[in-house]
Amino acid sequence: MSSKQATSPFACAADGEDAMTQDLTSREKEEGSDQHVASHLPLHPIMHNKPHSEELPTLVSTIQQDADWDSVLSSQQRMESENNKLCSLYSFRNTSTSPHKPDEGSRDREIMTSVTFGTPERRKGSLADVVDTLKQKKLEEMTRTEQEDSSCMEKLLSKDWKEKMERLNTSELLGEIKGTPESLAEKERQLSTMITQLISLREQLLAAHDEQKKLAASQIEKQRQQMDLARQQQEQIARQQQQLLQQQHKINLLQQQIQVQGHMPPLMIPIFPHDQRTLAAAAAAQQGFLFPPGITYKPGDNYPVQFIPSTMAAAAASGLSPLQLQKGHVSHPQINQRLKGLSDRFGRNLDTFEHGGGHSYNHKQIEQLYAAQLASMQVSPGAKMPSTPQPPNTAGTVSPTGIKNEKRGTSPVTQVKDEAAAQPLNLSSRPKTAEPVKSPTSPTQNLFPASKTSPVNLPNKSSIPSPIGGSLGRGSSLDILSSLNSPALFGDQDTVMKAIQEARKMREQIQREQQQQQPHGVDGKLSSINNMGLNSCRNEKERTRFENLGPQLTGKSNEDGKLGPGVIDLTRPEDAEGSKAMNGSAAKLQQYYCWPTGGATVAEARVYRDARGRASSEPHIKRPMNAFMVWAKDERRKILQAFPDMHNSNISKILGSRWKSMSNQEKQPYYEEQARLSKIHLEKYPNYKYKPRPKRTCIVDGKKLRIGEYKQLMRSRRQEMRQFFTVGQQPQIPITTGTGVVYPGAITMATTTPSPQMTSDCSSTSASPEPSLPVIQSTYGMKTDGGSLAGNEMINGEDEMEMYDDYEDDPKSDYSSENEAPEAVSAN
């Protein structure tokens, strides 16, 4: 420290060297003038107990040390800062008026004494040498420092300052880091709380992740359980459906067995006269009729008999006449109500029934005839009843017990098989002169005479004409029935089918005879229209169309105002099915049936009902054309010009596809034209109401079929259904009388719930809209595939054109709206 402080006056030579030299020279002059005074001054306060011999080496060593220190100090910046500090300190000390500190004063005094000591020449030379050496060193240092690289200065400076900063900051930082124990405890507590918070957060995240995993797994498990449950439910539903189908099949089989055995609820309560009571009861007991217990059969008593479908089938085969019961003789309250409703509806007295042929039958005669027929229509194959002949009634009424007259019949069937002898009753008891004699070679040559005479020529006109004139139909039908009734044949379907084929052949032969003997005039057209039936006419308008054709072709008006113009042949199973379909709808008008007694042609079995739709007197108003028809009118003409032989149906398909591919902008003018035409049409016909006519095509399973194809399809389906169920119902055979009249078959009372298993055409229950009204309906037992088709499609081209002639007058009627797909408009 002493060396640095001693050399401080010389450090500022770079800034004010001239000032220093002038100061020194002035001091030397003053000292020279006052030399003698200075020599007498005491030395102790100046030297501070230091001899002169020691002061000079100290000064020289100080100068050398300063030179060495200056040589080490190579930074110009450091030199300037140090010089500035020293100069400021030196000037402060020189200019300050305050007293100096003791150490500073002692240093100054040492310098002064060292300067003033010795001779002036020596001191001047030494000072000049010192100044020169200092100047030279300064110049050398300045030139050397200018040539040095700045990086070296920065390195030295950074090293020096780094050491100083390390000495400074390490202690402070250590003090701050170490701190007090309280601060360290606080920091430790903060760190521990932060660590615990982080640990808890980590645990929360892990727990949430585990919960999410568990939730996803539970959801997957729930979905799997739901899928398993749904699959189990579907399997259970499928099993239940299969069980239901099996149960339904078993129920059908049981019901068919019940039908065969006769265990059915009562459908009809016949009334028997007293003279046939015992015989009918015995016959019914042998044939499976179920009599209620405790019934006594006394003369004058009315007793109920449970009718079963098998007896109805036999009744259909036997050809029963209409059942008319006297109101006073009916003991069952339900029958009383039904007959009263029937009498009130049609305004007829049920004591007598007038047939179309002008014959009137009273209830006594009807009862006698019905009793005889009931006793004879059920024949057990295993137990033939012994013949119980009774004397014929000579009072003019028909005696049902003339078995000897039946034995005289010349039918080939009765000659080969003596089935007629085993019958308990004879329904064809007549004088021998009235029974026509038929040759064995042509048993059916006179079955359908064209003359509309009474089927039975009896001397007494008030007597009942027997519905069965000869023994041919009854004997053959009963033989077939007894063969089909055999329990051994129910499992043998081949035998049953053979019997059915024989019956079909018989019916075809009857139809051929009928076609040969019918006149080719108006009656032929009428019968052909009637033979078309209602099976394919599934909507109301087409049936109305068929109804209206009858009076138009015959030109005959209805005798009774209550009867509608429709004519339907009930002797065909197709027509019976059509009537059943009509009866099944509650919206249809109630129908009732008149039976063919006055005439001999099949076409007289008719259904009368009110006409629906547009009356024949009303003019036909065409529909206004829609947008498609407006567009298609010209397009159709263009296509016909290009392809004259193209069918209308193909043209309509082409036009329909084109119309669908058109954009709305292209269709817009045609829609405007449609609006204009609709407005004009509304102004012209303000009361117009669109009544669509039936279409000639039927859509079945997405396919468009014609009427003939539809009929054939329905026949095949019915045949399949008939073969699917066990053959437990007796097919019915048409019964012909001696004069060739084909009589209708079964007599039924209308029930509201027809049995579903009776799918064949011989099912005779019908669902009537009013269950209180008995509907007597007749059916043939067998439906032929080929024969029925031939009978249904007997219409020639002319008749079909007459039926559909107005289709071509208004071809746009096939297009009900623009949204529907256009259908084929054909001329055939």
From Swiss-Prot:
Q: Where in the cell is it found?
A: Nucleus; Cytoplasm
Could you state one GO biological process linked to this protein? Answer: negative regulation of cardiac muscle cell differentiation
Per the record, DNA-binding region residues lie at 621-689
Q: Cross-link Glycyl lysine isopeptide (Lys-Gly) (interchain with G-Cter in SUMO) maps to which residues of the chain? A: 404, 417
Annotated region Disordered: the residues are: 1-51, 380-470, 753-828
Specify the superkingdom.
Eukaryota
Q: Which PROSITE patterns match?
A: HMG_BOX_2 (PS50118)
Biased composition range(s): Basic and acidic residues: 25-34
Query: Known SMART domains for this protein?
Result: HMG
Location of Phosphothreonine modifications: 119, 401
Where does this protein have compositionally biased stretches of type Polar residues?
393-402, 439-461, 753-781
Give expression by tissue: Expressed in a wide variety of tissues, most abundantly in skeletal musclen.
CC annotations in GO = chromatin; cytoplasm; nucleoplasm; nucleus
Q: What is the effect of changing residue 766 to L?
A: In TOLCAS; uncertain significance
The residue ranges flagged as biased composition, category Acidic residues, are 796-809
Database matches in InterPro entries: HMG_box_dom (IPR009071), HMG_box_dom_sf (IPR036910), SOX/SOX-like_TF (IPR051356)
* Principal location listed in the UniProt entry: nucleus
Return the Pfam families for the record: HMG_box (PF00505)
Any keyword Coiled coil?
yes
Q: Name one GO molecular function term.
A: DNA-binding transcription factor activity
Q: By its UniProt entry, which SUPFAM superfamilies does this protein fall under? A: HMG-box (SSF47095)
Q: How does it assemble?
A: Homodimer. Interacts with DAZAP2. May interact with CENPK.
Q: What's the disease link here?
A: Tolchin-Le Caignec syndrome: An autosomal dominant disorder characterized by mildly to moderately impaired intellectual development and behavioral problems, such as autism, attention deficit and hyperactivity disorder, and aggressive episodes. Highly variable, additional features include osteochondroma, craniosynostosis, dysmorphic facies, arachnodactyly, and large head circumference.
**Its biological function?**
Transcription factor that plays a key role in several developmental processes, including neurogenesis, chondrocytes differentiation and cartilage formation. Specifically binds the 5'-AACAAT-3' DNA motif present in enhancers and super-enhancers and promotes expression of genes important for chondrogenesis. Required for overt chondrogenesis when condensed prechondrocytes differentiate into early stage chondrocytes: SOX5 and SOX6 cooperatively bind with SOX9 on active enhancers and super-enhancers associated with cartilage-specific genes, and thereby potentiate SOX9's ability to transactivate.
Q: What is this protein called?
A: Transcription factor SOX-6
